[in-house]
């Protein structure tokens, strides 16, 4: 599994992969390292994207099954990444070209904007059906980004939202055909590229302070 960083002009493109792109410890390490690179290289904005059937399928359940004694550490690691994305000091957009489930859907919500493929892929929180309650931090993140109506619909039903449904309820900001998802995300961010990073970071930390505190408060 290799995550790659490229640029479109001054906008960083973080490529998550072409498989299920689950959140293994290696995946999380690479993601964080590339965020560091994007910042150090002077990116004005960032888009995350994946190739194939999945944007990401979320938590690495196989790794968790084999390392049950490290569950607390792992959840803390995932939530630290969500908190960082939520407050990244640049405009961000998730280009969702495939399925986005569970923690991956939370990662998408941690971006400032979301563009979803119109004709394929589902956005879903399956936790209610797989009997895994949301942590306080994860619930706080979702509720910070969605209206109460959308949060209840997404969190308590296990509903799989297609692109049009996700846009209608406010989960994503736009939809596009397969070959236009990335371009739409880039166009969304391009006018925002000259915003001051320190100011953006400060605003996000204030806006999402409660969610960030809950994400970082892992026992």
Residue spans of the language-model regions?
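Catalytic-core regions built around general acid/base machinery
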Residues: 34-37, 77-89
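Glycine- (often His-adjacent) and acidic-residue-rich active-site loop
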Residues: 49-81
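Glycine-rich beta-to-alpha active-site loop
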Residues: 82-130
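Conserved CoA-thioester-binding segment of acyl-CoA-metabolizing enzymes
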Residues: 1-49
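Hydrophobic/aromatic residues within transmembrane alpha-helices
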Residues: 48, 107-108, 166, 185
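Hydrophobic, secondary-structure "cap" segments at the distal end of domains
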Residues: 138-149
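Amphipathic alpha-helical segments at domain termini/boundaries
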Residues: 1-17, 153-194, 202-219
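Short, active-site-adjacent cap segments at secondary-structure transitions
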Residues: 53-57, 101-102, 210
């Amino acid at each position: 599994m290799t995550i790659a960083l490229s640029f479109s002009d001054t906008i960083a493109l973080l490529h998550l992969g072409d498989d299920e792109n689950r959140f293994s410890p290696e995946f999380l390490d690479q993601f964080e390292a590339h965020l560091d690179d994007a910042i150090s290289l002077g990116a004005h904005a960032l888009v995350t994207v994946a190739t194939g059937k999945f944007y990401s399928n979320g938590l690495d359940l196989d790794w968790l099954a084999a390392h049950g004694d490290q569950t607390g550490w792992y959840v803390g690691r995932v939530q630290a990444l969500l908190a960082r994305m939520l407050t990244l000091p640049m405009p961000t957009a998730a280009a969702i070209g495939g399925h986005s489930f569970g923690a991956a859907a939370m990662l998408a919500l941690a971006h400032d904007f979301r563009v979803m493929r119109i004709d394929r892929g589902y956005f879903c929180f399956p936790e209610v059906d797989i009997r895994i309650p949301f942590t306080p931090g994860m619930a706080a993140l979702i509720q910070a980004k969605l209206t109460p109506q959308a949060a209840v619909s997404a969190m308590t039903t296990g509903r799989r939202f297609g692109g049009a449904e996700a846009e209608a309820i406010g989960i994503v900001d736009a939809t596009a055909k397969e070959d236009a998802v990335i371009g739409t995300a880039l166009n969304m961010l391009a006018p925002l590229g000259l915003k001051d990073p320190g100011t953006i970071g400060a605003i996000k930390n204030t806006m999402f302070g409660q969610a960030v505190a809950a994400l970082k408060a892992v026992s």
